[in-house]
């Protein structure tokens, strides 16, 4: 049976842990609000850009014209999956869920492509796949530190260049899609070639006038669209990470409080037993002296 000192030490240790988890929960909640604000600010621009590109692509398809190489279908022999995870842990199943979703995607598409490569954004994903001896073509380091749109642009530009050169035939983004603070959905999204939305053909019958030209607009807008998709995935992943960590730390804080209550009860019972034993010894000694 543990001594009173041992129980006191355990209570103190759990209280210290509770302070840490409570502080981490508050920090994650603040970061989550900022990430949500960034997503809301980005969404209108991304939606309008997607609609505009969809109309131009649909009109080009109606004219039986290949509008741009990024939109043109071709034989897909080599694919690459860019997996977005976090640099830090203590986020529940955030990293494990997207890693397992990626592995399932690799199995499901093993016959579709001659070769599927992996790239990672985030140390947790890199470590996960290395531990399973899966080759990682490239690890994008330092992306999560001071997350900025310029980093998304650089990643998008690299994959656009590799796609246009024929080095890779399809590029996918694997990330956690943010639903709420307690819900994140692991998804695999096709980045390249660009897929037009299902309702893109709604504006194909309207004879829009594009200046300087349809082709010039696509040359300018398509790289922005690819960069925006990468940026959106990074923001969604960041919000999902903070939400998952906030939930995990809230659960850890509650568990710590329950453990403190249990240890306190154990301490009081042990102390009561100790006092009772002392009193009995005193009474027994007094009786022996009579």
UniProtKB/Swiss-Prot annotation:
Query: Per the record, GO CC terms?
Result: plasma membrane; proton-transporting ATP synthase complex
Q: What Gene3D superfamilies would the database entry show?
A: 3.40.1380.10, ATP synthase, gamma subunit, helix hairpin domain
Protein task: Produces ATP from ADP in the presence of a proton gradient across the membrane. The gamma chain is believed to be important in regulating ATPase activity and the flow of protons through the CF(0) complex.
SUPFAM superfamilies recorded for this chain? Answer: ATP synthase (F1-ATPase), gamma subunit
Q: Which CDD domains match?
A: F1-ATPase_gamma
The alphabetized UniProt keywords are: ATP synthesis, Cell inner membrane, Cell membrane, CF(1), Hydrogen ion transport, Ion transport, Membrane, Transport
Database matches in Pfam families: ATP-synt
State the similarity comment. Belongs to the ATPase gamma chain family.
Q: How does it assemble?
A: F-type ATPases have 2 components, CF(1) - the catalytic core - and CF(0) - the membrane proton channel. CF(1) has five subunits: alpha(3), beta(3), gamma(1), delta(1), epsilon(1). CF(0) has three main subunits: a, b and c.
- Which GO terms of the molecular function aspect are on file? ATP binding; proton-transporting ATP synthase activity, rotational mechanism
What PANTHER family is this protein classified in? ATP SYNTHASE GAMMA CHAIN, ATP SYNTHASE SUBUNIT GAMMA, MITOCHONDRIAL
How is it placed in the membrane, per its record? Peripheral membrane protein
Q: List the subcellular locations.
A: Cell inner membrane
Principal cellular location given in the protein's record: membrane
PROSITE patterns, A to Z:
ATPASE_GAMMA
Gene Ontology biological process terms, A to Z: proton motive force-driven plasma membrane ATP synthesis
The name on file for this protein is: ATP synthase gamma chain
């Amino acid at each position: 049976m543990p001594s009173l000192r041992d129980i006191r030490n355990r209570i103190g240790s759990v209280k210290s842990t509770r302070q840490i988890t409570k502080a981490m929960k508050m920090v994650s909640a603040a970061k989550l609000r900022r990430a949500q604000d960034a997503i809301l600010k980005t969404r209108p621009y991304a939606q309008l850009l997607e609609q505009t590109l969809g109309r131009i692509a649909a009109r080009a398809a109606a004219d039986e014209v290949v509008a741009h190489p990024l939109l043109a279908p071709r034989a897909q022999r080599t694919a690459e999956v860019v997996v977005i995870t976090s640099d830090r842990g203590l986020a529940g199943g955030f990293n494990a869920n997207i890693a397992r979703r990626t592995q399932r995607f690799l199995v499901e598409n093993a016959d579709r492509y001659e070769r599927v490569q992996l790239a990672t954004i985030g140390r947790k994903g890199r470590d996960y796949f290395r531990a399973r001896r899966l080759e990682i073509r490239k690890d994008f380091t330092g992306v999560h530190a001071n997350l900025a749109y310029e980093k998304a642009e650089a990643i998008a530009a690299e994959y656009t260049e590799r796609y246009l050169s024929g080095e890779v035939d399809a590029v996918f983004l694997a990330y956690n899609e943010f639903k709420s603070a307690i819900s994140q959905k692991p998804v695999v999204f096709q980045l390249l070639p660009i897929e037009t939305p299902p309702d893109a053909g709604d504006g194909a019958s309207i004879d829009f006038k594009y200046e300087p030209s349809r082709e010039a607009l696509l040359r300018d807008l398509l790289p922005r669209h690819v960069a925006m998709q990468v940026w959106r995935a990074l923001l969604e992943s960041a919000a999902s990470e903070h939400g998952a960590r906030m939930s995990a730390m809230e659960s850890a804080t509650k568990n710590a409080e329950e453990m403190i209550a249990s240890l306190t009860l154990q301490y009081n019972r042990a102390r009561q037993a100790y006092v009772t034993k002392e009193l009995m010894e005193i009474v027994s000694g007094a009786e022996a002296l009579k």
